[in-house]
């Protein structure tokens, strides 16, 4: 199979190296990643300056073709699909990210956005994240990525979609299983640290603490874990995501809410 791999941690990150090298013996793997750290850039694109891409060597096994791109994670996948590859890949993978992408993290995540770019182009995609910001034992996550990819090949999905995969930061023999999950709630208590540079000008660092599982019990589905809950239980979490953000459950209530305004507008 032809596999395109991106990330947001950059071309030098050990997570993408583990994933690409693990897949390379059985697949045609092309890596296109940012040339530097691009975490939390969301689905941003570069439109006001050129994008540059250079092939890199020595960081991956010989079977892997790798490019370092000056753009965002989404730029990397878009550029690969539109210019660098001679034909579309069978799958787009992203990661393995250093740190989890749970709940509302996916709205900010360059890792998830890179994979979502594949889905926008009609290609089944997977985003992989390892739930530690410090531990770099990526091989169990890479091994699971290989297993999941083989399962997708043998049992194709009915339509292209994004699978957001979070792997708990525990030894492989302590992983408690694989759970199909829904997106949880993972917000942050933001804190901006105010500092003064040597020239007397003010600047800020974004910091803060994670607030997890703030879901209203009345809205909870007791039969499907959230991704946050699954990781707490040492399970691999697989969450299907889509780019259509329409709040479908709100459409009918909003029709009644909007009717008075529509009537008023009709007489203007």
UniProtKB/Swiss-Prot annotation:
Enzyme Commission numbers on file: 3.1.3.5
User: Of which family is this protein a member?
Assistant: Belongs to the SurE nucleotidase family.
Tell me the gene name.
surE
Pfam families reported for this sequence: SurE
How is the cofactor bound, in the record's words?
A: Binds 1 divalent metal cation per subunit.
The organism encoding this protein is: Acaryochloris marina (strain MBIC 11017)
Q: Which reaction does it catalyse?
A: a ribonucleoside 5'-phosphate + H2O = a ribonucleoside + phosphate
What are the record's GO terms for cellular component? cytoplasm
SUPFAM superfamilies in UniProt:
SurE-like
What domain of life?
Answer: Bacteria
The name under which this protein is listed is 5'-nucleotidase SurE
Q: Which cofactor does it need?
A: a divalent metal cation
